[in-house]
Amino acid sequence: MRRNGKEGKDRAPGRPQRKGQEVASRPWIFRGLDRNRVTAKNILWHELIGLKAKIIRASHPELVGIEGYVLDETRNTLTICGERVWVIPKDVVELEFEVGDKRIRINGRELIGRPEMRLKKRWRR
């Protein structure tokens, strides 16, 4: 019960009011707010989550050819969602990122480290 006995609206702004009005939405992947600003020069210091990635070369032959969107990034791994979800170690692969109509190749060893730590390395140089 609400203050002074008044019933308030039991919903968040922009949401359906009644229980049966929920809209089933398709799954989507957050691809970053400024993903169009990614270039070959700044990809090392940019957020990789949401970019489309493909593995070009790897020390393990089963990793070659995996492609999908980057879902998560840790210090030493990338989580890529394509046909299924793969956790890929950064240090053993060469990746190709698709940004708009450009393709950017980068060695995974250059990506080792958390994104915020890679940015610090840039400013220390």
Curated annotation (Swiss-Prot):
Transmembrane segments: none
Compartment list: Cytoplasm
Catalytic activity: Endonucleolytic cleavage of RNA, removing 5'-extranucleotides from tRNA precursor
GO biological process, one term: tRNA 5'-leader removal
Entry keyword ATP-binding: no
GO (cellular component) term, any one: ribonuclease P complex
Region (Disordered) location: 1-24
Superkingdom field: Archaea
Enzyme class, first EC level, given as a word: hydrolase
Keywords: Cytoplasm, Endonuclease, Hydrolase, Nuclease, tRNA processing
A Pfam family annotated for this UniProt entry: RNase_P-MRP_p29
GO molecular function annotations of the record: ribonuclease P activity; RNA binding
This protein's record includes keyword tRNA processing: yes
Its EC number(s): 3.1.26.5
Cited InterPro entries: RNase_P/MRP_Rpp29_sf, RNP1, Rof/RNase_P-like, Rpp29/RNP1
Biased composition (Basic and acidic residues): 1-13
Family listed: Belongs to the eukaryotic/archaeal RNase P protein component 1 family.
Quaternary structure and partners: Consists of a catalytic RNA component and at least 4-5 protein subunits.
Function: Part of ribonuclease P, a protein complex that generates mature tRNA molecules by cleaving their 5'-ends.
Name the UniProt record assigns to this protein: Ribonuclease P protein component 1
Taxonomic classification: Archaea, Methanobacteriati, Methanobacteriota, Thermococci, Thermococcales
